[in-house]
């Protein structure tokens, strides 16, 4: 049974937790993370959700909810490792964006890792496939409805900044 800590919209801890699946009171939030893994060639790692999950079959970046007692960065490191087997340190995460929605403080991170697909250890309960794609291909996939809404929104809101980050990775 997982519990999530609750916060105000300004991230002040409320000192309360809620069980996964329970309604979150209006004006209260829990932390959700997304991690976009980019390799030194500028390719983005996508994982495909298993068919039986919400948005089954859609492609996404690693992510999930911070459990009680976890910081956003700790959750990002844990989710990336659980879903792909990729190890990252908190200080390797580049904070890219935060989106506040109905009940979520959704933190988006970028991490640079060169990991061949053959070295990934996919969490079979959540992920059924993985692939490296260019930013242009990711845009195409989002337009065709092949990505989760979260990825599509990230591209829509922050695509230019992601392009700059990728150029920085490739050329620096």
Feature names for model-found ranges:
Residues 10, 39-42, 50, 112-117, ...:
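Short loop segments at secondary-structure junctions
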Residues 18-21, 56-57, 68, 95, ...:
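Nudix hydrolase/Nudix homology domain
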Residues 6, 37, 46, 110-111, ...:
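Conserved hydrophobic "DFG−1" position in protein kinase catalytic cores
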Residues 4, 28, 43-44, 58, ...:
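A residue-level structural signature of the nucleotidyltransferase/glycosyltransferase Rossmann-like core
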Residues 32-63:
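A glycine-rich, hydrophobic loop/mini-helix early in the fold
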Residues 45-46, 61-94:
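The catalytic Nudix box helix
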Residues 28-30, 92, 125:
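Short solvent-exposed loop/turn micro-motifs enriched in small/polar/acidic residues
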Residues 1-34, 40:
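Acidic, metal-coordinating catalytic segment for phosphate/diphosphate chemistry
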């Amino acid at each position: 049974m997982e519990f999530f800590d609750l916060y105000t919209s300004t991230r002040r801890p409320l000192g309360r937790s809620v069980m996964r699946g329970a309604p979150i009171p209006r004006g209260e939030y829990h932390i959700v993370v997304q991690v976009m893994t980019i390799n030194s060639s500028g390719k983005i790692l996508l994982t495909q959700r298993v068919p039986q999950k919400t948005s089954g079959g859609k492609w996404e970046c690693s992510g999930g909810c911070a459990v009680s007692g976890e910081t956003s960065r700790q959750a990002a490191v844990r989710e990336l490792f659980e879903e792909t087997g990729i190890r990252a340190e908190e200080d390797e995460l580049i904070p890219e964006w935060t989106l506040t929605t109905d009940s979520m403080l959704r933190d988006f991170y970028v991490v640079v890792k060169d990991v061949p697909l053959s070295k990934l250890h996919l969490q079979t309960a959540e992920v059924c496939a993985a692939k490296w794609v260019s930013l242009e291909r990711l845009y195409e996939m989002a337009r065709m409805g092949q990505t989760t809404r979260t990825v599509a929104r990230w591209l829509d809101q922050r695509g230019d900044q992601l392009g700059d980050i990728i150029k920085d990775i490739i050329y620096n």
